[in-house]
């Protein structure tokens, strides 16, 4: 049976084949290809940039000439005991802008360096005392009560609390000399910061 099936299948396949030879193909005319012009690619223009505005210039303030008259007034104030220890707190910025208060603090140190009235707490001792309170060495105490607490740790009799306030273009320097034991303000003064 399988033989007959195979023979029948072969006969079907063979009858499907062409018995006549294939006709020769007619040559087709060549297709002409028209050249395509490439599209003009425009060079991308760089985006128009706006000029970057200049950052505001930091004002150069003459801190030493600003603090010196106030320090002179303070040294002549009534109720100041010569030979006392003074804690010089860093100057705070309470203006409406940015100021280099580290330079102001440095100017206060310079102005008080040659005085005969107070002995200033050394900065290394101040940094150690700040660490005792859990503050970083660069931390501005920010409040009078913290400054007095720190002064008690370093055994200072006085604290000089200073801040700069007002408009950043014409700031005012305020200074207060406080007695550590009572928190009493022994002297206060203010003056314009000179440029």
Curated annotation (Swiss-Prot):
Location(s) in or outside the cell: Cell outer membrane
Disordered as annotated region, ranges: 19-55
PROSITE patterns: PROKAR_LIPOPROTEIN
Membrane-protein topology: Lipid-anchor
The keyword Lipoprotein is annotated on this UniProt entry: yes
Keyword Zinc appears in the UniProt entry: no
Endpoints of the signal sequence: 1-16
Biological process according to GO: peptidoglycan biosynthetic process; regulation of cell shape
Bias kind Pro residues: ranges: 24-38, 44-55
Lipidation sites (N-palmitoyl cysteine): 17
Keywords: Cell outer membrane, Cell shape, Lipoprotein, Membrane, Palmitate, Peptidoglycan synthesis, Signal
Pfam families: LPAM_1, LpoB
Any one annotated GO CC term: periplasmic side of cell outer membrane
Primary residence: membrane
GO molecular function: enzyme regulator activity
Lipidation (S-diacylglycerol cysteine): 17
Protein role: Regulator of peptidoglycan synthesis that is essential for the function of penicillin-binding protein 1B (PBP1b).
NCBIfam families reported in the protein's UniProt record: lp (TIGR02722)
Family designation: Belongs to the LpoB family.
Subunit record text: Interacts with PBP1b.
Name this protein carries in UniProt: Penicillin-binding protein activator LpoB
Source species of the chain: Serratia proteamaculans (strain 568)
Taxonomic lineage of the native organism: Bacteria, Pseudomonadati, Pseudomonadota, Gammaproteobacteria, Enterobacterales
């Amino acid at each position: 049976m399988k033989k007959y099936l195979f023979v029948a299948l072969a006969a079907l396949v063979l009858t499907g084949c062409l018995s006549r030879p294939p006709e020769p193909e007619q040559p087709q005319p060549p297709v002409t290809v028209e050249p395509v012009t490439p599209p003009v690619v425009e060079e991308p223009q760089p985006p128009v940039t706006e000029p970057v505005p200049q950052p505001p210039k930091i004002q150069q303030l003459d801190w030493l000439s600003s603090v010196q008259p106030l320090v002179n007034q303070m040294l002549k104030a009534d109720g100041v005991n010569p030979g006392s220890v003074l804690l010089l707190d860093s100057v705070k910025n309470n203006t409406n802008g940015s100021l280099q208060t580290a330079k102001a603090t440095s100017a206060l140190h310079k102005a008080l360096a040659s005085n005969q009235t107070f002995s200033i707490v050394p900065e290394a001792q101040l940094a150690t005392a700040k660490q005792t309170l859990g503050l970083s060495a660069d931390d501005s105490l920010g409040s009078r009560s913290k400054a007095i607490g720190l002064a008690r740790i370093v055994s200072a009799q006085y604290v000089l609390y200073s801040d700069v306030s007002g408009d950043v273009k014409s700031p005012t320097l305020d200074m207060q000399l406080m007695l550590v034991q009572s928190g009493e303000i022994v002297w206060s003064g203010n003056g314009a910061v000179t440029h």
